[in-house]
Amino acid sequence: VRQRDPAVELWSTPLLYLKGFHAIQSYRITHYLWQQNRKALAIYLQNQISVAFDVDIHPAAKIGHGIMFDHATGIVVGETSVIENNVSILQGVTLGGTGKECGDRHPKIHEGVMIGAGAKILGNIEVGKYAKIGANSVVLQPVPDYATAAGVPARIIGKDKDAKPAFDMNQNFIDLGM
């Protein structure tokens, strides 16, 4: 978090004050309980975590390491979502389904992705490694590796093979090298 968020000056800041960090660590407990087939307790705790932090992560979701929820308020991560390592997600993001379908129905977010504030990624689609999703975009189709997607509905507006969006946190969409 310290390398990505200029507001974090001390290593202790996330541990003490950042609810995104707290929500992810709390999720890890509920995920463990879910895997131990203690699903009722996992769902109960997840509900309490959602109330406390305004972050709703289903205990069955799979979340890697190096994840940053910046500001965190209003983040929703559905049951079959997968978030790989080193992903940055800003406030108001939803990784959701598209309706009442059952089974594997939520997005798969690959390594190094940055998802801008208010973005909605819906359905069992993949967002490729080091992709960038623009603020308030609605993503309904897969996004290739290193691509930038923005708009409603989202479309590919650029590609940058050198980008590391989860780390540089650059939300500027000008000069995308197309």
Predicted regions and their residues:
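Structural signal for interior beta-strand "rungs" in well-ordered beta-sheet cores
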Residues: 50-157
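Terminal amphipathic alpha-helical/low-complexity segments used for targeting or macromolecular assembly
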Residues: 1-49, 164-178
